[in-house]
């Protein structure tokens, strides 16, 4: 049986925590590591779509009107042909389900239940699994499906979480994010208990941290560890791998470049957020296999930078074409 994609929803019911930034850069990093990645832009702002050149099989770039007519939210309420919603980007291993701020939510007026009644779709818990069923069509094509969801507690968010294998939550470096993350965990519990899913929570981490050595951050980290254990049945789920702030991150967004591209295109050392994201995915969450670190070197990332973060030595031969990871 062919291996199917691992799907991860980047979710937090609170906006402004960097969910879209993390999901886009995470998908890009995994693609640089040689994984086949699908980035599902389910955030109605469509910011990740704006970061990418979205093209069809003929190489034609999609317009905003093209994306409007697609209306990705149709896959949330019933069966669709997923081939009509997946497009290539300028990156070899990265495809996207595009979205745009002008796309109207298919639920429109009325409640979620009323819309399902109009569509003549299944009643009961099964109605939350339309996206899960649709993604089953294409799981074998990819290694990872990264989903950027909406920052809210609504049925769109529930359907997104119901479709994934794991949830990962970025949080702002303040004390106002514990409850929103708890809400995310409650949605996971709903999906597992009511929909008979088996969704795991990878945990939450602090994003956009200015100074990891500052006393205020150390106090904040201690508070999050304590609150995490208090609210999550002692499990904690706090991932002590902060993503640090970097002024260059703002520049990369303005120029519509992912972090690793910005560093490579400007011939600078890996930005702190690049190092932290690599550390999060390789060291902490183990989503990147050691053998795939070689692909980063082939994609222009310095082997010395990779070794500093991961502890893995990447041997590069003299012609710099063949690489392999060493212990």
Predicted regions and their residues:
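P-loop NTP-binding core
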Residues: 1-327
């Amino acid at each position: 049986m062919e291996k199917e994609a691992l799907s991860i929803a980047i979710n937090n019911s609170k906006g402004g925590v960097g969910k879209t930034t993390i999901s886009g850069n995470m998908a890009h990093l995994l693609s640089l590591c040689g994984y086949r990645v699908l980035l599902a832009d389910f955030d109605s702002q469509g910011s990740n779509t704006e970061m990418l050149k979205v093209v069809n099989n003929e190489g034609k770039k999609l317009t905003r009107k093209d994306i409007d007519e697609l209306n990705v939210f149709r896959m949330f309420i019933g069966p669709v042909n997923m081939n009509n919603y997946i497009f290539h980007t300028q990156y070899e291993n990265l495809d996207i389900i595009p979205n745009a701020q002008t796309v109207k939510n298919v639920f429109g007026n009325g409640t979620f239940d009323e819309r399902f009644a109009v569509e003549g779709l299944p009643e009961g818990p099964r109605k939350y699994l339309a996206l899960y069923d649709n993604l089953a069509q294409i799981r074998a094509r990819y290694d990872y499906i990264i989903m950027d969801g909406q920052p809210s507690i609504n049925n769109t968010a529930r359907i997104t979480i119901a479709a994934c294998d794991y949830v990962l939550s970025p949080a702002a470096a303040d004390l106002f994010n514990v409850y929103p993350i708890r809400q995310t965990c409650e949605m996971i519990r709903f999906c597992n208990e009511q929909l008979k899913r088996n969704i795991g929570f990878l945990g939450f981490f602090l994003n956009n941290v200015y100074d990891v050595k500052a006393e205020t951050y150390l106090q904040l980290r201690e508070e999050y560890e304590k609150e995490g254990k208090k609210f999550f049945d002692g499990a904690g789920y706090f991932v002590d791998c902060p993503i640090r702030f970097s002024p260059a991150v703002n520049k990369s967004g303005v120029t519509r470049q992912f972090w690793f591209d910005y560093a490579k295109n400007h011939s600078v050392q890996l930005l702190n957020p690049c190092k932290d994201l690599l550390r999060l995915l390789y060291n902490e969450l183990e989503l990147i296999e050691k053998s795939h670190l070689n692909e980063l070197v082939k994609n222009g990332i310095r082997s010395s930078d990779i070794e500093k973060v991961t502890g893995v030595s990447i041997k590069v031969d003299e012609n710099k074409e063949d690489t392999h990871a060493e212990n």
